[in-house]
Each structure stands twice: as structure tokens, then as C-alpha cells.
């Protein structure tokens, strides 16, 4: 269903916006969700997507969406302002701990080793959720299809000596983490990250966000977009540890209280009360 009062202004006037049918929320048990989808996907290039992200949209493959739920606004788009980021003691410790990891930035591409790590991660972290049964095609559609400026970042340990395999002097170090990012006009957008799940107390996810912040700084980009934060979701709690954290509230970006106590009520009938769509 198109919402005329939320049609975009130029240069997005060629896009249309539709609300999906209701479906079970994947973040909060017992809730019903809907999404607003931007179409057609072939018109969403990097410049257009930058404006959409600033308006609270995200992407999954070539599918660009934002939450559009009846009576709920628990999902808050969040971003870190790079120049004002202040790492806490734990984040500095994690940064130092994984300082030897070698990050390689590459175009999106399929690699059997990456897919194997993805499946280990899903089986350990999201068992029974469906993604732990993703086929190669589903993996590629989810993470390797993009119409914008996207990159795959591979994190490996430094190469080691292989005395038992002297024929492999240039063997890469052990793969620890893969991160997909989008390069926007005003920042980096974190798409998805998966890492070796069998290692305790690694905090790879925290290191990855810290790395993205430093990468954005080196590219002179002002923001790192972290997707959605839900105060009631333990899986998303780590995002609130990055300070300052800005959230998109009622159409405007502002600094959030780390506790989330300054957020509007989650249960609120908001259809018909949103501000006009103005990216």
C-alpha cells in the first residue's frame, strides 16, 4: 500500500513506498511487525540510499526497508558521530587485544571459507531461527547482492609458520570475522557481521564497530550507521555502549541517553502521526 503523505521529495520522486503484510517480529516475542519497502530497487543507487538511510531505512540484499509497525516504534535507527566518539575502557581493551588482526577490504564476492564461517556462526548464535539452514544461494542473496557501493571486510590473524606444510609459505592467517559494509555519502553503514563463535570472551563485534569508526575517520566520513537499536532486546544492548549514540526520533537525529530512558513510549499508535517523508 502506498502512503501518499510519505512519498519522497526529489531526487527520490521516482521511488514508491509500500507497506508489507504483518509478520511475526524477529526481535520481540509476541509482537507483530510490518515494514515499509522502497521500490523499484534498480533506482536505489548509492546517493539515493544515503538519503534513505538518513531517513531510517536499511537494506537486506537489494531489499530496502524500514520498520512500519502498527502501534510500536521500538526499533530506533542509530549512528555514531565519528569525531565525538569516546571509547570506554572495555572498548579500548578490546581494540588492543585484537590489534594484530589483519583487515582486508574487498568487493563483495563468494568464498567457501566465508560461507562455512557464516554457517558456524548461525548454528551457534541463531540455532532454530531459520538462518542456520541458509543455502549458498540464500547466503549470497542476503549478503552478496547490492546495487550500491558495498564492501566485504575480512579479518584474519597474522600468517603463521607452517612447518608441517612447507609448500604453503604464503598461507593466510586464520579467518576470524567477516563484515559487510556500505559506503555512503556521509558515513559507513554496518550491514552484517559474523565471526568465529567458538572462542570465548573475544568481543569481535565490539572490535568490528570500533574498526568501522576508525575506518570512517580515515575516510573523513562523519557517521557510522549501526542499523536499529531496541532497548528491550538483549542482543542489541552492545550498540548502546558506543557513546555518543544518535537516534532518529520523530524524524530528527539526536543524541540518546545510554539508558534509553529518554526514548518515546514503545507502545504508541503512530500511523497517521508520522512527519512527512523528508530525507
Curated annotation (Swiss-Prot):
Protein origin, superkingdom: Bacteria
Reported function: Functions in the N-end rule pathway of protein degradation where it conjugates Leu from its aminoacyl-tRNA to the N-termini of proteins containing an N-terminal aspartate or glutamate.
UniProt family annotation: Belongs to the R-transferase family. Bpt subfamily.
NCBIfam families, per database record: PRK01305.1-1, PRK01305.1-3, PRK01305.2-3
Key words, A-Z: Acyltransferase, Cytoplasm, Transferase
Top class in the EC scheme: transferase
Main location as per UniProt: cytoplasm
Pfam families: ATE_C, ATE_N
Organism for this UniProt entry: Paraburkholderia xenovorans (strain LB400)
Chloroplast found in the keyword field: no
EC number(s) recorded for this UniProt protein: 2.3.2.29
Molecular function GO labels: arginyl-tRNA--protein transferase activity; leucyl-tRNA--protein transferase activity
GO BP, sorted A to Z: ubiquitin-dependent protein catabolic process via the N-end rule pathway
Known catalytic reactions: N-terminal L-glutamyl-[protein] + L-leucyl-tRNA(Leu) = N-terminal L-leucyl-L-glutamyl-[protein] + tRNA(Leu) + H(+); N-terminal L-aspartyl-[protein] + L-leucyl-tRNA(Leu) = N-terminal L-leucyl-L-aspartyl-[protein] + tRNA(Leu) + H(+)
The name this protein goes by in its record: Aspartate/glutamate leucyltransferase
Location of the protein in the cell: Cytoplasm
GO cellular component: cytoplasm
